[in-house]
From Swiss-Prot:
Part of the 50S ribosomal subunit; part of the 5S rRNA/L5/L18/L25 subcomplex. Contacts the 5S rRNA. Binds to the 5S rRNA independently of L5 and L18. It comes from the Bacteria. The gene is rplY. Signal peptide: none annotated. GO terms for cellular component: cytosolic large ribosomal subunit. GO terms for molecular function: 5S rRNA binding; structural constituent of ribosome. This is one of the proteins that binds to the 5S RNA in the ribosome where it forms part of the central protuberance. Keywords: Ribonucleoprotein, Ribosomal protein, RNA-binding, rRNA-binding. One of its GO terms (biological process) is translation. Residues 188-208 are annotated as: Disordered. This is Large ribosomal subunit protein bL25. The keyword rRNA-binding applies. Belongs to the bacterial ribosomal protein bL25 family. CTC subfamily.
Length: 208
């Protein structure tokens, strides 16, 4: 994975009021931290970061160029946490974690199902199990997502984490027996729906 350059500046003011002013200017408050550096408050260009998230995903490897106090610093980092407005969905705060290219790190990556399952062609329904798995790799080997081919799955068959093939240098940490995808019959889905409906119904109250 190639590092994406993001230019940020030192943030002299912290607190809610200062953060609101930044957002009105199209900027975001953020922080850089890691094992070998002190916490560093920064100002992030919102539009540029949104573009990186849209094209590279939240597991993007970043080269942060920090300016301020008459000097420039560079950090290799990953996005550790993204905060968004609960209603509007826009970014409100971002945490960056400094990494070493020689040290492995853990990350949660999305699982994307690819292909039309054989069982679906036979009248079954494909059900998605877990949508994310935990992995470990060097920063340069960190994938944006794990793509899994499900075209071979027939009715009644499933695919587990232990059967996934990952790129070289990537180790899966999630439990191997965790189900990624299953092809079930239409009747099985109908039965499950009926059971959920029955469970959700309240018993009739006797008339007074």
């Amino acid at each position: 994975m190639q590092a994406q350059t993001l230019e940020v500046t030192m943030r002299p003011e912290v607190g809610k009021q200062a953060a609101r002013r930044l957002r009105r200017q199209g900027k975001l408050p953020g922080i850089i931290y890691g094992k070998k550096i002190a916490n560093l408050a920064v100002i992030i260009p919102a539009r540029q970061l949104e573009h990186i998230l849209a094209t590279e995903g939240e597991n993007a490897l970043l080269k942060l160029v920090v300016s301020g106090d008459g000097q420039n610093k560079e950090f290799t980092a990953v996005i550790r946490e993204v905060q968004r407005h609960p209603l509007k969905g826009n970014l409100t705060h971002v945490d960056f974690y400094q990494v070493s290219m020689e040290d492995k790190l853990r990350a949660t990556v999305p699982v994307i199902l690819e292909g039309e399952a054989r069982g679906v062609k036979e009248g079954g329904i494909l059900q998605h199990g877990v949508r994310e798995i935990e992995i470990e790799s060097l920063p340069a080997d960190l994938p944006e997502s794990i793509v899994v081919d499900v075209s071979h799955l027939g009715v009644g068959e499933h695919l587990t984490v232990g059967e996934i093939k990952v790129p070289a240098g990537v180790k899966i940490l999630s439990e191997p027996d965790t189900v990624i995808a299953t092809v079930v019959t239409t009747r099985a889905v109908e039965t499950e729906t009926e059971e959920e409906t029955t469970t959700g119904e309240s018993p009739a109250q006797p008339a007074e």
